[in-house]
């Protein structure tokens, strides 16, 4: 653990070492950390900041206390003899800068996927061989327990290390990926990605040296002992690194901090089913999976639907790299608003950041299919959105499929626009389905500077929350983005503050307020957060007596200086006379 503390500020290093010495790998609370520091004669006023820094550096993890969900348990992460995530990211950044505009960024994702599954597969093979099985037996056992990378009929192994030996490396990589797609039912779409990327088409004098350098760098990365979260984080890093550029081209990328906020607000329970009807590259589903595993240790089943075929394939690769078993997820390709692939009551939670203000989904489009028509008439009779924005169509769709809760990111305009959207909004409010609305800070998203909102809807509101909506104005809850200067991001302290207020269901001046539906009716169903809670400017407490004493002291010093100057000038005048 000493190595993990090496690059930290001295005050963090000292206090972190005390906590590690005290707790080792046992869980502990904030209060217990305070006590441990005080026992060593250290004031504990910044313990929360200390734990936040250790979390950011991934030295500790935090999860909910099963005895009291309002509290958190902290635990040091066991070190392993393996490359660090930072090393991975450093190598990937080099690769990203190398390809920049010459090669599609998805090549990095595909190479990462192929190299990682190959290393994991061969590690399994080694394990089976060490237990006394033959190489062929080990290949077949690894096929059954992980992914099929050995073709039994051909007697050929399709792993990265074998393929890159060829003089026609890129051609062989493309062929191997197509073969793996044929050998694995859950990867059959991989061939489409290879086709779209046109790997073989990259084989020309301009690009060949780039691709050869990529292969060299990936050869040096060993994923066999790296945990799935670190590999998955590397995959997510590639997506986020290229997000500013790809968002300009129409792709949607949700910052992982916003996703974590929603997952924490939903407090997804074990043995749950979760649906993201606009799943993109799968971040919402993966964070839901992580949340359940970290906090409850149970099973979770994930459904995703995405109309962009390539993004749907990337979501599948993302899930595999995060260690999600193929039996624990299903990703569908298609338009969720017009052709949802699963039907009512099949999931516990729905979660999404759908495209904001998506146009072209008015009544004429949504009533064509009788089954789909039912969705937009369940909560609101004739609840079809205007042609220019499908925001409230997404809300109805997600409510339709959820047994328990919905967490959705929307454009803030959805809270107060009139016309058909107001009609839908009114009915959703009157049915008491909205539990909380959080106004996010501006400049969180790559493709828009305007602030978004998070809406939590609950079909099973506790008695004390019925007839009320919690409004949280988190517009000032951000830190500057460490990599993209023009952006902000939600820090862990910001997320914790929002979640704590939601769980405690409390009023805090300038930050949160519980509002009765009657007040919302009086405001004509306008749900604009700033209408109900507005940040309070910090008032400076002025101690007049202290200020007066300081003023007198300044005046006294000024007089002393003035007297000194006058004396100096008079001395000069006397000397000259």
Swiss-Prot record:
Enzyme Commission number(s) from the entry: 2.1.1.72
Catalyzed reactions per annotation: a 2'-deoxyadenosine in DNA + S-adenosyl-L-methionine = an N(6)-methyl-2'-deoxyadenosine in DNA + S-adenosyl-L-homocysteine + H(+)
Assembly behavior: The type I restriction/modification system is composed of three polypeptides R, M and S.
InterPro entries in the record: DNA_Adenine_Mtase, DNA_methylase_A-5, SAM-dependent_MTases_sf, T1MK-like_N_sf
Family (UniProt): Belongs to the N4/N6-methyltransferase family.
Alphabetical UniProt keywords: DNA-binding, Methyltransferase, Restriction system, S-adenosyl-L-methionine, Transferase
GO MF entries: DNA binding; N-methyltransferase activity
Source domain of life: Archaea
Name of the protein in question: Type I restriction enzyme MjaVII methylase subunit
Other remarks on this protein: Type I restriction and modification enzymes are complex, multifunctional systems which require ATP, S-adenosyl methionine and Mg(2+) as cofactors and, in addition to their endonucleolytic and methylase activities, are potent DNA-dependent ATPases.
GO BP field: DNA restriction-modification system; methylation
Binding-site residues for S-adenosyl-L-methionine, renumbered to this chain: 251-256, 281-283, 306, 335-336
Xref: Pfam families: N6_Mtase
Known function: The subtype gamma methyltransferase (M) subunit of a type I restriction enzyme. In the presence of the R subunit the complex can also act as an endonuclease, binding to the same target sequence but cutting the DNA some distance from this site. Whether the DNA is cut or modified depends on the methylation state of the target sequence. When the target site is unmodified, the DNA is cut.
